[in-house]
Structures are given as C-alpha cells and as structure tokens.
C-alpha cells in the first residue's frame, strides 16, 4: 500500500522533489514471537540449558523501508532504504539506520544495475537475491535456515555493484562485486587492505520449476605478515524447487573452501565451533566442506506445512578439527489475511565435533511460535 504522505514526513530531511514522487512507498514487516530452546553441550562439564524468551524476526526479519522510482525516458531510476529492528525491545538490528539495504538502481531493456549496500546473491535480502530458490525455510526459522547448512556467509555487503539481466525465456544472469565488504572498517576500497567479494549467479524459471546456480569468491584482506599469502575463499551452490501442486519440493547441494566461519543459528552450537571475527584469523581457520538439504511445502488445514532435513560436513583447512552437522525441522504458517499470519515450528540440530583433544556431539531443540504483520 502506498503511503505517500507518511513517507514524505519520514523523509523530511531529503530534497523536496522526493515528496512529489507518486511512487514513494513506505512498507514494513513486524515478526514477534516466543521461543524455547533446549541446548546440550556434551562437553562433560557444562550442564544442559533451557531458555524461554520473546524474540523478533524468527521467520521474517522485522523491518521498515522506503522505496520509490521515477521513469526517465526509456529507463527507470529508483531507490530502496531499509531499516532492520528488533520488535521485541525496539533497537536497530544492525547498528545502522539503513543496515538492511541502502541502494539506488537504474533499470532498462538491458537489465538492472544496483549500487550501494545490498544483500549477497546467495542471501534472501534484496531484489537480486537468489537464496529463496533453495530452501522453504529461507535463512530463518532458527536451525532450519539454509545458512547453517553451508559454509558461506549469507549477509550483506557495502560499496557494491549488482547487475541483473533481462529474462531470456525464464533465464536470468546476475553478477555482483563489492569494493569493500564492510564500510565501517579501515582501508582503501578495492585494495588488498580490505575484504572484497564477487559472485555470479544463473537462475531459470519455467512454470512450476525454478533452479539456481551461484558461485561466489571472497578476497580476504592481506594486512598481516602471517596471513599475507592466505588463499581466498569460494563456494558453489546449486539447486531449486518444483511445484507438484500437492507439494512443492526443494533441494540444494553446496561446496565451500577456505570460507571464514561455520554459521550456527540456534542453541549455542557456536560455543564449540572455531568461529572468528577478524579476517587474519579467518584465513588461518578457514573451512572446507560440503552440504545438502531437502525440503517441502504443502497446503494443509487452511495453511502451509513446511518440512526439511539437511547435512553439512566441514573441516579446518589448516587444522585437524572436523564438524558434521545434521538438522530436521517442521513448521506451519496460517494466513489470517494477505498481511497477517501466525506461525509455529520445531527444529532439531546436532553437530559432531571431531577435535584433536576430544570429541563432542552437542545438540539443540528449538520450539517457536509467533505472529507476522506486514504493512
């Protein structure tokens, strides 16, 4: 729904010409729910923990945004500014006013070019994202999210250019490059002093079938003597979904090498995984491995049932530790209207850590329920 007057009020610090744009739209999503998690460390000293809390964005990230466009001759120029926030207690989710997206784009007969802060091609954030092709749980739903089934980063990048081609009988090509992944870090853009990123994706959609292939390449910064010759990271993911009317089936397989972290979402499974926060450490503790997942959605009882299973096998490139993870999840959504739906879900994740000194098999059970409202 277009809310031009309210959008103009929120944009009071912008140029007056923006107020008159008839296509400026204010939009948003609020997802608030309850979550119970049982975590078992299996380290011989840590007791199992049970947590019950109110949470934001369990199945749809809470956000608000402004978007608009203007037709200029044969091209369309537009923008998207999107803020993420925690609906359970109010603060910004990414310590930035427009942390989810801040971009401008130009669209014409030769495709669309985006510039600014965008979601990666492999993510589910932004108009160019392809992540929704591979899993019915997207990157959310706790441990069910596909980000914990791969070894790549499903986040966002600053200082980026993203190109999306026109559709050729259902076939689209996407290309993306970031001159500097994180604009808050020091270092000159497009230099070896900063992390950079490149990706190429191909998608195909024809009737009930949709498929995707993405390859991405992470160029780690080389500012420390110990890691100046560290290999860059890359990953490949291929998969898709097919609608059989009674059920839509999803599947994907992926491979990664020298990637920075193994993402773990719910239950504290990252407590034993050697995740790191700096690129220098990322290089030394990069991971190699593969993952696979299967999922499905089906109409039931007036709503939609969502189910999935997955497996990921990873090892340190320059170490001895290995991590084998599998997950299973079941969810349900019920729409009261086009704008409001309720959800419930249960997830189970187990990761066997085969380490030099000892082995661990921690696990987590998550139960969630909540309400999503869109405006």
State the predicted function of each range:
Residues 362-375:
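Outer-membrane beta-barrel "beta-signal"
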Residues 1-23:
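Gram-negative bacterial Sec-dependent N-terminal signal peptides
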Residues 30-36, 79-83, 117, 175-177, ...:
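Transmembrane beta-barrel strands of outer-membrane/channel proteins
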Residues 4, 48-62, 97-100, 155-159, ...:
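Residues that define the transmembrane beta-barrel architecture of outer-membrane proteins
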């Amino acid at each position: 729904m277009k809310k031009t007057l309210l959008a103009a009020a929120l944009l009071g610090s912008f140029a007056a010409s923006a107020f008159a744009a008839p296509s400026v739209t204010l939009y948003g999503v609020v997802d608030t729910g309850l979550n119970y998690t049982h975590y078992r460390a299996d380290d011989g000293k840590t007791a199992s923990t049970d947590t019950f809390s109110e949470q934001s964005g369990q199945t749809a990230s809470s956000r608000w945004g402004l978007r608009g466009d203007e037709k200029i001759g044969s091209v369309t120029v537009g923008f998207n500014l999107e803020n993420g926030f925690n609906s359970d207690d109010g603060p910004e989710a990414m310590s930035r006013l427009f942390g989810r997206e801040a971009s401008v784009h130009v669209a014409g007969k030769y495709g669309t070019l985006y510039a600014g802060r965008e979601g990666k091609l492999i993510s589910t954030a932004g108009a160019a994202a392809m992540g929704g092709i591979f899993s019915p749980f997207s990157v959310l739903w706790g441990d069910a999210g596909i980000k914990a089934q791969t070894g790549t980063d499903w986040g966002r990048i600053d200082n980026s250019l993203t190109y999306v081609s026109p559709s050729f009988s259902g076939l689209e090509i996407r290309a993306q490059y970031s001159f500097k992944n994180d604009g808050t870090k020091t270092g000159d853009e497009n230099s070896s002093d900063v992390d950079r990123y490149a990706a190429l994706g191909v998608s195909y959609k024809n009737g009930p079938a949709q498929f995707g292939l993405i390859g991405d390449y992470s160029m780690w910064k080389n500012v420390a003597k110990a890691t100046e010759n560290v290999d860059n990271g890359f990953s490949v993911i291929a998969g898709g979904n097919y609608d059989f009317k009674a059920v839509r089936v999803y599947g994907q397989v992926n491979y990664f090498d020298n990637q920075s972290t193994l993402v773990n979402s719910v239950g504290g499974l990252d407590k034993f995984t050697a995740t790191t926060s700096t690129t220098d450490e990322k290089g030394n503790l990069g991971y190699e491995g593969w993952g696979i997942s299967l999922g499905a959605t089906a109409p039931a009882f007036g709503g939609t049932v969502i189910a999935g299973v997955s497996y990921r096998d990873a090892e340190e490139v320059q170490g001895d530790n290995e991590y084998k993870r599998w997950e299973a999840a079941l969810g349900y959504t019920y729409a009261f209207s086009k704008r409001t739906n309720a959800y419930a879900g249960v997830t189970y994740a187990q990761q066997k850590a085969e380490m030099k000194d000892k082995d661990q098999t921690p696990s987590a059970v998550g139960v969630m329920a909540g309400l999503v409202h869109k405006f």
